[in-house]
UniProtKB/Swiss-Prot annotation:
Annotated CDD domains: PAL-HAL
GO biological process: L-histidine catabolic process to glutamate and formamide; L-histidine catabolic process to glutamate and formate
The family this protein is said to belong to: Belongs to the PAL/histidase family.
Subcellular location(s) of the protein: Cytoplasm
Protein name: Histidine ammonia-lyase
Organism: Rhodospirillum centenum (strain ATCC 51521 / SW)
Catalysed reactions, semicolon-separated: L-histidine = trans-urocanate + NH4(+)
Primary location: cytoplasm
Amino acid sequence: MTETLRLTPAGLTLADLRRVLAGPVRLEIAPRDLEAAEASARTVAEVIGSGRTVYGINTGFGLLARTRIEPDRLAQLQRNLVLSHAAGTGEAMPDRVVRLMLVLKVASLLRGFSGVRGEVIRALAALVSAEALPLVPAKGSVGASGDLAPLAHLVLPLLGLGQVRLAGRTVPAADGLAAAGLRPLELGPKEGLALLNGTQASTALALAGLVAAEWAFDAALVAGALSIDAAQGSDTPFDARIHALRGQRGQIDAAAGYRRLLAGSPIRASHLSCARVQDPYCLRCQPQVMGACLDQLRFAAGTLATEANAVTDNPLVFPDDGDILSGGNFHAEPVAMAADQIALALAEIGSLSERRTAMLVDPHHNGGLPAFLVTDGGLNSGFMIAQVTAAALASENKGLAHPASVDSIPTSANQEDHVSMATWAARRLLEMADNAAGIVAVELLAACQGIDFRRPLRTSAPLEAVHAAVREEVGFYDRDRHFAPDIEAARGLIAAGRAASGTDWLAAA
């Protein structure tokens, strides 16, 4: 059943954004919540009636801003803007990201500072409710002046042009409009610019990456706890007193997560008096590394939740004062930097997970487990190449984690001479999260294999539940077999939340 999301000005929460990414929603907007938007549209009409020249309303754009456009050509100006700016390329963005882009654009316009009529806002909302999602090429934005090309493709169907995704098929825009009960619109003054200008593409991509990163973080924390018991590691490094002395919030919370997962483990109780004094960093320093990653994800979540409710087009209309002001809210630097933070966290989450897998397959460091976690080594190779796969994915993410926000390239004849690269910064996150999930999937299998070698001893109750879920899908490795399907099965468990800690890590963001 499709959920209903009631949109109000500046009312989107992180929970709402997750819901939009999770599946179809029906948008509901109360008539009173369109009043501010209608007031801003009236202000635009008054400016035109007064004969004033105002950028974006009766002028050209970018370097052509000094060109005045006559009143009888203003509708054509807005149409031309959408057509000329729909110049993206590459594969289409995922449907869930496009759905969120539409919701973010509606939320921004509802604030009432963009000069867009309620009719246009309702049309965008109708596309969401009908799950008629515009086909938006993923490449073509530098994150200033806004996400112009992606947003042009997003609104192209309102003119009856372009394509939409409908019931899993790509169809002409006319079919999507019909499904939403709409007809092609003629855009009014400034409306094309308001629809195209903004950070909604990069923000939607970054939010999708954030949610995927949270899943990867949580699964890595669970797999890391399993690896501790598989390698007969110590839980002493997770003592709350250690982390309280440092005072880093993410570290404190991560350590608490490990304590909850490991509490009551018979494996741990079996080796309390062993001679090993310290574990490798990949086990011992998990709260420090994962906690720092958590802090980055939480900070990024706060930035993106703010941006989701922001007004980021230009110029901005202030109906109470009758002013229309040009600024730079379209510059997506906050989104770019938030995406860079998520990328760094994803790279480190995967890097640490891969190191734990490498430790588990190494007979010199894994607490007495067989080499590559398989008996009859030599005849069997066990987890040898699965660990190499994890290493390959970890190295890919290291390259992808290079900060995008430090890059800039001038555009529009040097009028737009510094850009954020936010869309690329955000777009790579889904690939990085997918890589991280693959790395953690390998560790999850390796850790469960290590736990089996500790039988009849058992791990803690929550970790035994995860082990059981894995073994429902993937059997014990008593000999070599085709490995790739098992990695995909473990990835499926992670995606389904069956290897989760049950903690909402971003709740306090």
